[in-house]
Curated annotation (Swiss-Prot):
It comes from Roseobacter denitrificans (strain ATCC 33942 / OCh 114). It is found in: Cell membrane. It is a multi-pass membrane protein. This is Heme A synthase. It catalyses: Fe(II)-heme o + 2 A + H2O = Fe(II)-heme a + 2 AH2. Belongs to the COX15/CtaA family. Type 2 subfamily. It is an enzyme of class 1 (oxidoreductase). Its EC number is 1.17.99.9. Heme binds at H293, H353. Catalyzes the conversion of heme O to heme A by two successive hydroxylations of the methyl group at C8. The first hydroxylation forms heme I, the second hydroxylation results in an unstable dihydroxymethyl group, which spontaneously dehydrates, resulting in the formyl group of heme A.
Length: 382
């Protein structure tokens, strides 16, 4: 007769031979890739940040129309001989901007504005290459985390669209016999607006990759809905103000009225509605465009205070600090905007004003992110 089966001993012995469970193994497997992708996105963020600044300087130096053709590939090489430089100069001499306002230019002067525009376009090519190499590398090595293929591809598509919109903008100013000396302001606003959208998505993805997927899932459960909703509204309102700022830059409206708080001694400028049909004034009248930018700024800072009052009620220190940073940056931006007007929008102040707009934009995104994914702290504050 066989001996009784030692059921519990056999089970215990079998269990002893199995490897111990390792919690978080799947997350650890992808953590290295998440960190690498985050570094790649941080590089892209820095490049786009610089691109926005260079684009602003290109506009402020009236360099944007110096290259009259769009050659995405062959245009990567600048003129390499005197004959090539002469050819580029002759193309520029044929457009209205030169004939109307820049006939004084010699070759040396033309080269200055040409290098600004060439550098702006070249930086765009560099951004495209950095995106393509990074995306291709992670794709081939199968290191893209689940759910991220579409997000990273979307950035590339936005970048391609930005290049096309850039030429669409420039083409509006490369005219002959039409009396046009600048690009269309609404196209400039579209171009700048998309740049902020691209930068915003990159910043958001960087913040997402800065924390593990389980951590984000856990944080989502303690989402602060009021702060999230109000910061979303502030983000959209700020974007509107950025577009209005682009309209101001597009028609040099910042130099049309240099007093504050009034405009030419009036609360509402007398030149605001002089164009026909009337809708043109909202895009082309320096008086009305600057007036809209000013009034929107006043309302925006008031709304920022309201959002901050709600944000400071958050139970999470990191979230409260994020809203404090938003209020501080927005206040500084309003003050800088007034200074820009009073000094007639000189290039160095105007570019600082635009750069600070980027910082405000990112800080609002961070406050919104922390409202949706709070960083929980213990009673001890750790």
């Amino acid at each position: 007769m066989s001996s009784k089966r030692k059921l519990f001993e056999e089970v215990g012995a079998a269990a002893a031979t199995r490897p111990a469970a390792q919690p978080g193994l799947i997350d650890k497997r992808h953590s290295g890739a998440r960190k690498a992708i985050r570094v790649w996105l941080q590089i892209l963020f820095a490049l786009v940040f610089i691109m926005i600044a260079v684009g602003g300087l290109t506009r402020l130096t009236d360099s944007g129309l110096s290259i009259t053709e769009w050659r995405p590939l062959t245009g990567a090489l600048p003129p390499l001989s005197e004959a090539e430089w002469q050819s580029e100069f002759e193309k520029y001499q044929a457009i209205d901007e030169f004939r109307i306002q820049n006939q004084w230019m010699q070759m040396a002067d033309f080269k200055v504005i040409y290098w600004w525009e060439w550098g702006h376009r070249q930086l765009g090519r560099v951004i495209g290459v950095v995106w393509a190499l990074g995306f291709g590398y992670f794709l081939v090595r199968r290191q893209v985390p689940a759910g991220w293929h579409g997000k990273l591809l979307f950035l590339g598509l936005l970048g391609g669209a930005q290049g096309a919109i850039g030429w669409w903008m420039v083409a509006s100013g490369v005219t002959q016999g039409e009396g046009v000396t600048d690009v269309a302001s609404y196209r400039l606003a579209t171009h700048l607006g998309l740049a902020f959208v691209i930068l915003g998505f990159i910043a958001w993805y960087i913040m997402e990759l800065g924390r593990s997927a389980p951590d984000l899932m856990q944080a989502r459960r303690i989402k602060e809905g009021k702060q999230w909703g109000m910061s979303t509204g502030l983000l959209h309102f700020t974007f509107l103000q950025i577009l209005l700022g682009a309209l101001v830059a597009g028609i040099d409206a910042g130099r049309s009225y240099t007093d504050w708080p009034m405009m030419g001694g009036q609360w509402f400028p007398s030149t605001a509605l002089v164009l026909e049909p009337i809708w043109r004034n909202f895009f082309e009248s320096p008086g009305l465009v600057q007036f809209m930018h000013r009034v929107t700024g006043y309302v925006l800072i008031l709304f920022t205070v309201v959002v901050w009052l709600r944000g400071r009620r958050s139970s999470h220190p990191h979230t409260r600090f994020a809203f404090n940073a938003v209020l501080a940056a927005m206040t500084l931006q309003i003050v800088l905007g007034i200074v820009t007007v009073l000094y007639g929008a000189p290039a160095h102040i105007a570019i600082f004003h635009q750069t600070l707009a980027v910082i405000v934009w990112v800080l609002i995104l961070r406050a919104r992110f922390l409202s949706g994914y709070p960083i929980a702290t213990s009673v001890r504050g750790t």
